[in-house]
Every structure is written in structure tokens, then in C-alpha cells.
Amino acid sequence: MSNYGVKELTWENGQLTVHGLGDEVEPTTSNNPIWTQSLNGCETLESVVHQAALQQPSKFQLQSPNGPNHNYESKDGSCSRKRGYPQEMDRWFAVQEESHRVGHSVTASASGTNMSWASFESGRSLKTARTGDRDYFRSGSETQDTEGDEQETRGEAGRSNGRRGRAAAIHNESERRRRDRINQRMRTLQKLLPTASKADKVSILDDVIEHLKQLQAQVQFMSLRANLPQQMMIPQLPPPQSVLSIQHQQQQQQQQQQQQQQQQQFQMSLLATMARMGMGGGGNGYGGLVPPPPPPPMMVPPMGNRDCTNGSSATLSDPYSAFFAQTMNMDLYNKMAAAIYRQQSDQTTKVNIGMPSSSSNHEKRD
């Protein structure tokens, strides 16, 4: 802080003088003017403030991006802009008003360099903004972004055009192949029907189309039928009485046919036995020596399935069916078996009786 309680700045003989109340110390101003050169008419506020700032013995130089600038000139190189203070009083009031401010900031327009400080006693700080370069870089980045967006837009447009072109080419190729197939079929039809007119060909095509529609409908019906469950397609309803009666008749017919076949087999076996025994014509006398075959066991016809619906069994045509179609029961079978056994026993006894007499005759001859 300053040693003066109150201070003021005055402009005297081209120099800035400080006046104050209280204990005085050596003035910080020198008797010699700070600027050896004349102001050359540059009596602006910036010039006055520069004089106040340069009262310290140490001097500093401001550096700009383009090089050192010792004269603290503006961008134009001279103090060409004048504030227009022709009178000394106006300058004094301006300096006094500026001195009462706590912080002073001076912007040097040369090369975009800023200089700011809080008070006369505080240290100076330099800060280079380079607003021009920043604006340049900003504008350059914006330009690059814009160019990149334009390039992306052009690339997307080119890709979309390429896709459209490929799709159109594929469509044209498929259409060409379809026309070729149609033409080939028409040529084949022309070869098959060389004298047919266009109306005949159209009618043939109409018939083919109708046939294809019918086939398609049948295929759809079959697919639907296959997808439906079996119970929904054919509901299990109880069979009517007529169906039951027909099934019963068919089962009875099957049983009768089986019985007839069994009787025929039994009669054939009896005839074969009688033929071996010599009863069916002139047989040898030793036929009774051969034991008769055992009678076939009684065959019980299997019961037919009542649930079966297919009762139409094809019967074999037998020429002896009229002869053997006779009723036979167990009583007749037993009687025939007893008669055959009696005949066999009689023949065996006769043979046994005749054999000793023949042996005695041989002895007598001897």
C-alpha cells in the first residue's frame, strides 16, 4: 500500500505527478520526463496510463507472436486514434477518474496481446489470447467439419445409388429369365400343336390353370386334414343296428364255412383209412395188419372277432363240395369209429386162426 492516505495524480509539464496528504516520502517520480520523445500528439488515455506504469525503474518488454514490440504501439503502428481531449482539464479529470479505480486493465491491441493488473503496486501479468489465431483455428475446424459432413452425405448418396442400381439390375435379369421361360414354353407348345391357333393355345392355358387350381385346392385340403386330429375328423359314433346285423351274418357264414372244411377233412381221412383197410374195393388181405391212424382230434372253430368289419372272406372252389356237403355230428363219428374198430378186430382174429392151420398142413405134407 502507499504511504499516503489520500493521493491524486496531476499532469504537469508533460509529466504525471502524485500529490497526497500525510507523511511524505520520497516521491517515486523523477524530475526528468519518462518519455524522452515527444508524444507527437498522442494525448490519449492509453498514453497517460502507460506513463504511470513506466515510473518504476525496471522496465519490461511485451512479446507478441510476431516479435518484440518496444514502442507499445497499436496494430496500426502509431497512436492514430485520438480520444479528442483538446483541453488539459478534461485530461486531468480522466486521469483522476481512472486512478480511483481499484483494478486497472489495459489491452494492448498489438498482435492480440493483453496486459492486466489489479493496482500500481501489484505485480503485472501478461496473458496472450491470440484471438485471431483462435478464430482462425475455430473457423478452420468448422470448415473441416462441414467438409466432412458433405463428404459423408456424398458417400451415402453414392452408396444408395449403387444399391438402387444393383437392385434394378437384378430385377431386370429376373424379368428377362421369366420372359425366356415363357417363350420357351410357347415354342414347345407350338411344336406339339403346330396347327393350333392363338385361341386354342389360350384355351389350353385356361384349362391348365383350372387344373392347377383344383390341384392346389386338393393339396390345401389334404394338408388341413393331416393337421386336424383323428378324433375331430372321424367322430366315433355307435354303429347302427343294420351294421351289427350284417356283421353277425358274416360271422355266421364264416363259422359255417369253417365247419364244412373240418367235415371235409374228416371224411377224407376216413376214406383214406378205409382204402388202406381194403374196404373201398378189392384190397389185399393184409390191409388189416396196418394199424389205423388215430382219429384227428376234435377241432373247435375259432370265434370270430365281433369288432371286425371285413367279413367278406373268399372261399376256395372245391369240386367235391357237393359230395362232401353232408351234416356230421359226434354220434355219427363214434359209430363209424366203432364199426371200423370191429372190422379191424375181426380181420385180425381171422388171420390168427388161419395161420396155424396152414402150418399143420405143411407138417402133414412132410
From Swiss-Prot:
Reported modifications of this chain: Not phosphorylated upon light exposure.
Keyword check for Ribonucleoprotein? no
Q: What GO annotations for molecular function exist for this entry?
A: DNA-binding transcription factor activity; double-stranded DNA binding; protein dimerization activity
Q: Where is the composition biased (Polar residues)?
A: 59-71, 344-360
* Phenotype on disruption: Plants are hypersensitive to red light, exhibiting shorter hypocotyls and larger cotyledons.
Q: SMART domains, alphabetically?
A: HLH
The listed locations are: Nucleus
Q: In which tissues is it expressed?
A: Mainly expressed in leaves and seedlings, and, to a lower extent, in stems, fruits, flowers and roots.
Q: What induces it?
A: By red light. Stable upon light exposure.
Keyword hit for DNA-binding: yes
Q: According to the UniProt entry, which residue ranges have a biased composition of type Low complexity?
A: 247-261
Write down the InterPro entries for this protein, in alphabetical order: bHLH_ALC-like_plant (IPR031066), bHLH_dom (IPR011598), HLH_DNA-bd_sf (IPR036638), PIF1-like_bHLH (IPR047265)
| Listed GO biological process terms | de-etiolation; red, far-red light phototransduction; regulation of DNA-templated transcription; response to light stimulus
- Residues forming the bHLH domain are 166-215
Quick one: effect of changing residue 14 to A? Loss of binding to phyB
Task: Name the segments for region: Involved in interaction with phyB.
Answer: 3-17
Region spans: Disordered = 59-84, 131-181, 235-261, 344-366
* Keywords of the record: DNA-binding, Nucleus, Phytochrome signaling pathway, Transcription, Transcription regulation
Q: Which SUPFAM superfamilies does the record match to this protein?
A: HLH, helix-loop-helix DNA-binding domain
Note the subunit structure.
Homodimer. Interacts specifically with the Pfr form of phytochrome B. Associates to PTAC12/HMR/PAP5 which acts as a transcriptional coactivator.
Note on domains (UniProt): The active phytochrome binding (APB) motif (3-17) is involved in interaction with PHYB. The Gln-rich domain in the C-terminal region functions to modulate the transcriptional activity of BHLH72/PIF7.
Report the protein's function.
Answer: Transcription factor acting negatively in the phytochrome B signaling pathway under prolonged red light. Regulates PHYB abundance at the post-transcriptional level, possibly via the ubiquitin-proteasome pathway. May regulate the expression of a subset of genes by binding to the G-box motif.
In its UniProt entry, what is this protein called? Transcription factor PIF7
Q: Which gene encodes it?
A: BHLH72
